[in-house]
Amino acid sequence: IGEILRRVTGETLGQYFSRKIAKPLGLEFYIGLPDEKFENVTDIQPIIFSKFIKMMVPLIQAIPKSLLTHDLAFAKDFKNPQTISGSAFSNPDFEFEIPFRPNSKQWRKAEIPAANGHSDARSISKLYGILANGGSRDGIHVLDKKTIEQARQTSSEGKDLVLGNLNTRFGHGFMLGSKHISMGPNREAFGHGGAG
């Protein structure tokens, strides 16, 4: 979508989102973090690949996956390029090292809408409040009702082979709550918990 938008408007997705949605609604929400906002962002701490789990990887490799917890089985697959998880996260190699790559200036500045939007809780709440109430506020149109309905309806469900067979559900463009990923009691709630 980003390339199509750039060819039609001459703007990147981050620029377009800022001009048409974030600034008019007063949101501190960026797709590609501007240099002047770096001081407002804290580092993400990679929990799943803590130093302890990293030290355990050689031992984990010797244990059958059926005997491992989900996180440990994912850690085992993550380091094996022959698995779907390992293949996805090694293209390029995505190390959960300190410094953690998503904390780098290059990552934060990159415009990757599915992976590195930066915001604060107030702005995310305001944006999702608008989506939960029809998609428009103060004459600013974010999404139409039909698109929001498609986001709420399950379009895929099952084991996510990239995320270590975690059961997930997705609508169009958004994750939905599932057995392992809670989004509250409303089955139509949509979004993503994020990484930080």
Role assignments for model-derived ranges:
Residues 111-118, 188-196:
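Glycine-rich phosphate/pyrophosphate-binding beta-alpha loops
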Residues 2-182:
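Short, surface-exposed loop or secondary-structure junction motifs
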